[in-house]
Regions:
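Internal alpha/beta loop-helix hairpins
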Residues: 47-80
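N-terminal cationic and glycine-rich segments that engage phosphates or anionic surfaces
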Residues: 1-58, 159-166
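Non-DNA-binding regulatory cores of transcription-related proteins
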Residues: 73-156
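Conserved, well-folded catalytic cores of nucleic-acid-processing
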Residues: 20-23, 30, 34, 63-70, ...
């Protein structure tokens, strides 16, 4: 399965890869310096330098794989439906409470700030729906509910939602 990403997501990931590649020499130097301290079995600096290098390399591999397997999506869509980077005001019927969420790509989610993925149960239920639509959200056999889309706002500040670190 491909991850749906915007061209902006891919450009930011490529930029991060370039920055992380520039850090490689520094990690190598840290390892060489730590090795010079002697016995590696009890050398915390050496193990920390290796851990930092490996974490950097893992992030580079992850980002390259995300780019390689990405399906580039077009952010343009029907102006009257929920799309990527829209702020959506929802009425949760069972609680009679309103909540605002922003629908995003997988690389920019942050549930603590109300930024949800299109692939999430709520995101997939409201995606491409219109104001006034009553939508069924199926989280699991035990958790199901209805929401009503009250308002859709185009979020011109989607660039402020950073790429997730992990």
């Amino acid at each position: 399965m491909f991850d749906e990403l915007t061209q902006r997501d891919i450009d930011e990931m490529k930029s991060e890869i370039d920055e992380r590649i520039k850090l490689r020499d520094g990690f190598h130097d840290d390892i060489v310096t730590a090795k010079s301290y002697g016995d590696l079995s009890e050398n915390a600096e050496y193990h920390e330098a290796k851990r930092a290098k490996n974490k950097n390399e893992a992030r580079i591999r992850y980002l390259k794989n995300m780019i390689k397997t990405a399906k580039v999506i077009d952010e343009k869509r029907d102006a009257n439906t929920v799309g990527y980077f829209d702020r959506v005001t929802l009425l949760f019927e069972d609680l009679m409470e309103e909540q605002v969420v922003t629908v995003s790509t997988k690389m920019r989610i942050d549930a603590t700030k109300g930024v949800i993925s299109k692939e999430s149960p709520l995101g997939s239920a409201i995606f491409e729906r219109r104001v006034g639509d009553r939508v069924f959200v199926d989280v699991s056999p035990d958790v199901q509910y209805y929401v009503v889309i009250k308002k859709i706002e185009r979020d011109g500040n989607s660039i402020d939602i950073p790429i997730n670190k992990y």
